[in-house]
Amino acid sequence: MLLVYIHKNSPRLKYIFDLFIGKLMGISYETTQNVEEFKSYAGPKFNYSEHQIENEIFIYSERLLFEKGIEDQQFGFTEWDGIKAFYATHPKYSVPFDLFSASFYLVSRYEEYLPHLRDSHDRYNETESIAYTRGFLQKPVVNIWAQKFKSIILERYPNLKSANSKYKYISTIDIDNAYAYLEKGLMRTIGAYGRSLINFDLPQIVERTKVLMRLMHDPYDTYDLMHDLHRRYKINVIYFFLLGEYGENDKNVSVDNRNFQSLIQSLADYADTGIHPSYGSNIKQGRLQKEVQLLTKILKREVTKSRQHFLKIRLPDTYRQLISVDIKEDFTMGYAGNIGFRAGICSSFYFYDLDQEVQTPLVIHPFAVMDATFRYYLKVNPEQVIDLIKPLLEEVKAVNGTFISLWHNESLSENHIWKGYRSIYEELLKIASA
């Protein structure tokens, strides 16, 4: 057991200690505010306070974990053996920065509560983040810091028992649009033909007609292909279904469509499933609950997983709404505009509500890469995608974290927009499962 001296306790401190020491370092710990108890303890220990006591491992504590509410944070930057860090303290200390405050700042998404600009979809922009501006968005620094600090502890206390986590890969698939042409209903189909005529898009008219006449496979119907790939590479997969009312940014097949319901049920036979809360659910109250109830009815079982359509998160409101409808796990934590680690971590963690100063029961699973990021935001050629994924994957494997990818059924269609992305996905499964 590891004993930690603290000069003061707080909900924030307990939260980050449980995550950082308990989960990431795999070490059981207790805290004490009694200096004499700490000095007389002969076992493994370190000091997290404002003053060093003897010659123990010492981390200077900044104010963040003992504050309440949101305040502008002033911190210095440093590097720790080449790894970027902030809340810098002094090079003479065992660790030259307050790694617990820095970790809490990132994982709690403290900066997303501060004043910031939002994008056209009312999302926090990655360019506002400290990870982006300081150049460590592509590194799971919280995991790296935990691994390095664990080495310091074990070097002094080699007999201290600790657990080691194992690397894991999870593929997640968003079904925003189950089919390109099928099951759209008469009015939507007529409207689509009209738009194609106005745009002189003859190839799409021909393709749509062939699919509707069953002379050609619907290009977005890639479900058998995905099943074969996931089975071949022994992949854990989660499908998220968009069941929102039709709107400008919510254009899936109607939830009343029996073939769509059958598709959902068939995918749920061999994979985990979750709700993909619609764009509209972030605007109109009550929609989220309705969508969860619809999926529950189709699956005939409790729905506990979610990922926001368009990755729309507004803290703490979005997560509070999920908790209110009994969602237990969310997979939205990532950026649309860039790849990497939005919360600086590649392991799951509980959402800490900074407004209420409480650890919630909602588990956050951060993802690292999304197909649409490469295609629409980074605008890279398909040949470059795997080379951008590999370094992130290596970072996650090095710290025994969890690598989560976000793909869509339509990006495996090999249509003109997604040409080359089918082979990219298979290569991703191959290297991520190795």
Where in this protein do the model-derived segments appear?
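Terminal accessory/targeting
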Residues: 1-255, 347, 354, 358-434
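Catalytic domains of cell-wall/extracellular-matrix polysaccharide-remodeling enzymes
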Residues: 13, 281-358, 416-418
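Conserved hydrophobic/aromatic pocket- or pore-lining residues that grip, position, or stack substrates
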Residues: 174, 276, 322
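Metal-dependent polysaccharide deacetylase catalytic core of the NodB/CE4 family, i.e.
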Residues: 177, 181, 202-204, 224-313
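Glycine-centered flexibility motif
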Residues: 270-274, 338-342, 401
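Short acidic/histidine-rich active-site segments
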Residues: 274-276, 332-334, 406-408
